[in-house]
UniProtKB/Swiss-Prot annotation:
The organism of origin for this protein: Prosthecochloris aestuarii (strain DSM 271 / SK 413)
Gene Ontology annotations of biological process type: menaquinone biosynthetic process
Domain of life according to the entry: Bacteria
Gene giving rise to this polypeptide: menD
Protein name (database record): 2-succinyl-5-enolpyruvyl-6-hydroxy-3-cyclohexene-1-carboxylate synthase
Principal EC category: transferase
Length: 578
């Protein structure tokens, strides 16, 4: 067998084994050294391949796809800095427990550490952020094919295990790289036996089930029975089924629920926006929780952590579906690794309903509405609120970091009885790759997605706009343009004008309308809340991607946030004094 033949077979069995493991979505960036892998993936009848000129965009797209599906996409790139461009998304995938599979092509052994062109130290490049990193040898008939299949199967099981995360396979190839016609009857494959005639993977790993132990459920039920004022917190939850189970638990036990925007429950009609209530120190003091059940991961807002430090609950119990530590405020007294859905359902069957629950705060909703009248200019606050009210229940929502995710968490209104798939990159909370992540999320959901994003995040990933023309589902991109880093206006450094604007405000003065034109994307810039509502309704009903720009001034936005929040606090304080 000649070199071209073994290289072709080598690449084919890698792709074939991934497909047999139901890993069929490939994000490919053009490159020479990765030619064997690219051709194998492109020619396979059961793969879906999307091409990305930019590796960073490819990796964030794969991240968004994983958030939507719970399954990894496969990243294929050439040698050199290509694999390094995946790094930010790999970090987010690792911190956010999202599966991802990187196949980086590399120069062969004899070219490494020699000064050869486009050759870097790729093996292990992601360090501790990779769940597993492995070097595959150059294609050779001396290597049994079952060794390759076994490595692929282990890579798949590792990236999808608990905790899920990125896995990196670095694969060296010698020239020539061009494939030859595939020979599935090659003698090299004869040792595989039944694999050749079946469609099953070479080996399977049966994942450990994270069903709750009855002792854990009984212990939490016992503590719950003795609690006078328990509280449920829904933190970051990826799966709607988990979110629904937590909501059902809150309802069946009549326990107040704090639903973070990352929980998928914040927009649900049966939740109460405790984010707004907790602006008031009096409200927090008068609603002290002595037991807190925290389901899922981290929270967007700071108020729960501050409340925990004030309350010092007798018991703070975290239930999460992974073994990683979660104790940002060091108040956790018990941590349980189990399926969130299974634990919530078991606890609902074991426990008795509580006697009281936090009252709805409808007056607070009315106060926010007063600041978001239809004839008023559209603001950062009203944009988030209007999106939360008008988003199609059959669509998805992706939120950029910095102010968009915070405004949606604080000021959103309840939209209906359907759980709207909601995603954000809160593992490491970077502002990079947001458009790509939202595009991947939409692709995985196979439904339209609304993206709420700031101007700096938009600029950071603007090259991803070229991906959207080939999308089968559209994005509605709402860009909050306050000409800089608006969140820094809320920090103490904003009081030092000699350094603030240049180093933190960072005005960019770029033209979003021109960017939309350059990428042939529909664009609107509505001036009022009524006009924005009309524009958003039209965009969400369109089959094409569109950009809606919301222009804002950072100083006015800061003043509005302070004025509205103080108005909410005053009303809440009056309620608590009655």
């Amino acid at each position: 067998m000649n070199h071209k033949e073994i290289t072709t077979l080598w690449s084919w069995i890698i792709v074939e084994e991934l497909v047999r493991n139901s890993i069929c979505f490939f994000c490919i960036s053009p490159g020479s050294r990765s030619t064997p892998l690219t051709v194998a993936a492109s020619r396979h009848q059961k793969t879906t391949c999307k091409i990305f000129p930019d590796e960073r965009a490819a990796a964030f797209f794969a991240l968004g796809y994983a958030r939507a599906t719970g399954r990894p996409a496969v990243l294929i790139c050439t040698s050199g800095t290509a694999a390094a461009n995946y790094f930010p998304a790999v970090v987010e995938a690792s911190m956010g427990h999202q599966p991802m599979l990187v196949l980086s092509a590399d120069r062969p052994f004899e070219l490494r550490e020699t000064g050869a062109n486009q050759t870097i130290r790729q093996s292990g490049i992601y360090g501790s952020y990779s769940r597993w990193s492995f070097q595959l040898p150059e294609p050779s008939t001396d290597t049994p094919p079952e060794a390759i299949l076994s490595a692929i199967d282990y890579a798949v099981s590792t990236c999808t295990a608990n905790p899920s995360g990125p896995v990196h396979l670095n694969i060296a190839f010698r020239e020539p790289l061009e494939p030859v016609p595939l020979n599935e009857n090659s003698p090299w494959l004869s040792s595989l036996g039944k694999w050749n005639s079946s469609r099953a993977p070479w080996s399977r790993t049966l994942q450990r089930q994270s069903s709750p132990e009855s002792a854990s459920v009984k212990e939490v039920a016992r503590l719950l029975a003795s609690a006078e004022n328990p509280l449920i917190i829904a933190g970051h939850l990826d799966r709607p089924a988990d979110a629904q189970a937590v909501l059902n638990l809150s309802k069946s036990l009549n326990i107040a629920l704090y639903a973070d925007i990352s929980s998928q429950l914040r927009l649900h009609k049966e939740t109460v926006a405790l984010q707004q209530a907790w602006l008031s120190d009096k409200y927090v003091e008068q609603h002290r929780a002595d037991l807190v059940l925290h389901f899922g991961g981290s929270l967007v807002g700071k108020k729960p952590g501050q409340a925990m430090k004030t309350w010092r609950p007798d018991h703070t119990i975290v239930i999460k579906n992974h073994p990683d530590r979660y104790a940002p405020d060091h108040t956790v007294t018990m941590s349980i690794e189990a399926s969130v859905k299974a634990f919530a359902e078991a606890l609902a069957k074991t426990s008795q309903p509580q006697g009281k629950k936090a009252n709805p705060i409808d007056e607070i909703e009315q106060e926010i509405e007063r600041f978001t009248r239809p004839d008023s200019p559209v603001t950062e606050i009203s944009a988030a609120r209007i999106v939360s009210r008008l988003i199609d229940p059959g669509h998805g929502l992706f939120l950029a970091n910095s102010m968009p995710v915070r405004d949606m968490d604080m000021y959103a209104t309840r939209s209906g009885g359907t759980i709207i798939p909601t995603a954000m990159n809160r593992g490491a909370s970077g502002i990079d790759g947001i458009i790509s992540s939202a595009a991947g999320f939409a692709s995985g959901l196979e439904r339209p997605v609304t993206l709420l994003i700031g101007d700096i995040s938009f600029l950071h990933d603007m090259n991803a706009l070229c991906l959207l023309r080939s999308m089968t589902v559209p994005l509605t991109i709402v860009v909050i343009n306050n000409n800089g880093g608006g969140i820094f206006s809320f920090l103490p450094i904003s009081d030092q004008p000699d350094v603030f604007e240049k180093n933190f405000g960072t005005p960019q003065e770029f033209n979003i309308a021109a960017a939309a034109t350059a990428f042939s994307i529909e664009y609107q810039c509505p001036p009022s809340n009524a006009a924005f509502s009309e524009s958003y309704m039209a965009a969400r009903s369109s089959a094409e991607t569109s950009i809606i720009e919301i222009r804002s001034r950072r100083d006015e936005n800061l003043a509005l946030h302070r004025k509205l929040n103080q108005s909410l606090i005053d009303r809440l304080d009056r309620q608590q004094s009655c």
